Amino acid sequence: MYDFLRTDKVRLPSFSTTQTIVDGINLDETLKGYRTLAVRGRETSSRNIQVHDKNSYINSTNPFLDGAILLGSNIPAKNILVEYQVSTKNYRDQTELYELLNYYINKPLVKLIFTDDLKYFYKGTLANMGEIETSLEHKGEMEFAIHDPYKYSNEIFIEKFAGSGEIKRSMLYPVALEWVEIKAKTNTDKLIIKNDSTGRRIIIDSNITSTDRIKIYFKEFLVEQNGKENISATMDITSDYEDFEINTGDVISTNIDADIELSYRERKL
């Protein structure tokens, strides 16, 4: 005789190997009856390609005009699909579960972490919620639009230089800075922070003394002097503020004698 396994009666583990964390809230642990089944859409990213047909404006049978000319390409936004299971004892519990789930996920932008990749996070917006079955135990899907296709490290890395220095950390992609702080050792009326490897510069037109600290917060577009005075208006209009990035091997310097401290998050696809 054979012992057949009743797959419809197999007890599932209380938590899956991958759990979903939204803005620091672990849904699998917080929502009684909720379980993440699978997460799809993180693995690879294809590129959007812009091409020009070689023969589009020329009526010719020349074989060298076959194909197309690549004009450019970029990595598009991606969608992450979270498949989940809900199992409750009654519909009241199920209603409360979905009320909490909506509260956690239905915001303009949420921070998504999955427990099989705890060192990194995505930023996304709930784009679609699959149709909910009218049963106490059912499966569902929620889709998040990831506008920036990269995932970012939870850890913030800090580099410190005296005068100038090279980015030693090995990174796969260039990254924007979280902030950079300059501790001046001389007086100046113009501070220039430069990535010598790319030529990008940040220019501050302000009277700075040998004891001043200038800190630039890139996401907030904020420039502080000595931790209190907002001098953002002194940033020169020719600064490469939005394009200032660093990568492995880049050399960062200033035009004055100063200590440099900068921070950033690593990013990956």
Predicted feature locations:
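Intrinsically disordered, low-complexity segments enriched in serine, threonine, and glycine
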Residues: 152-269
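Polar/acidic, low-complexity leader/linker segments enriched in S/T/G and N/D
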Residues: 1-59
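Solvent-exposed loop and beta-edge segments used for protein-protein assembly and interaction
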Residues: 74-78, 104-106, 134-138, 172-176, ...
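Oligomerization/assembly interface segments of phage tail-like spikes and tubes
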Residues: 63-91, 136-149, 251
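Short beta-strand and beta-hairpin "edge-sheet" elements
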Residues: 41, 110-149
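Short, acidic/charged, Gly/Pro-enriched secondary-structure junctions
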Residues: 4-9, 83-127
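Short amphipathic beta-strand/extended segments with alternating polar/hydrophobic composition
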Residues: 14, 21-39, 121-127, 201-207, ...
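N-terminal, charged/glycine-rich beta-strand/loop interface patches
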Residues: 56-59, 63-67, 92-99
